């Protein structure tokens, strides 16, 4: 059997709803995927992780697509954000990371067992759709205490 590694890059709203995603081979640099991920967007702000830090990427996104790329800077960074901004970014990133955690742990996105590329794409899309449907059901049920409760929907 042959296994292929992949990376899942996604855009989400600040409360965790997945709006778009791109899948790349595991050996591709994260910063290259940003261009594909943001292809149809203009004038948005993206909060990325440290894998997207690059001196050229942030100004290029800003000048070409009017996209602000924000990320938590390293502790020893000279031009770190003010404390209030860092706290806000941390809070938003925590919610976004929860969405990714739910995709991997509850919907097993990291274990897509398929025999073809079409099967891989289909299964991945279904898992993202299941996450978003769970998210919307939680919103409709007023379970919006900052966490989408996928297990609670399924198991009661």
Per-segment meaning from a language model:
Residues 88-156:
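Basic, amphipathic alpha-helical segments enriched in Lys/Arg and hydrophobic/aromatic residues
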Residues 2-4, 17, 37, 48, ...:
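A general marker of short, structured functional hotspots
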Residues 27, 32, 54, 76, ...:
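Detector for Asparagine
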Residues 6-12, 24, 55, 74, ...:
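Generic signature of intrinsically disordered, low-complexity segments enriched in small/polar residues
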Residues 8, 37-39, 85, 107, ...:
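Generic hydrophobic alpha-helical membrane-segment signal
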Residues 1-63, 70, 74:
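Polybasic low-complexity intrinsically disordered regions
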Residues 45, 50-118:
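Helix-centered, glycine/charged polyanion-binding patches within enzymatic domains
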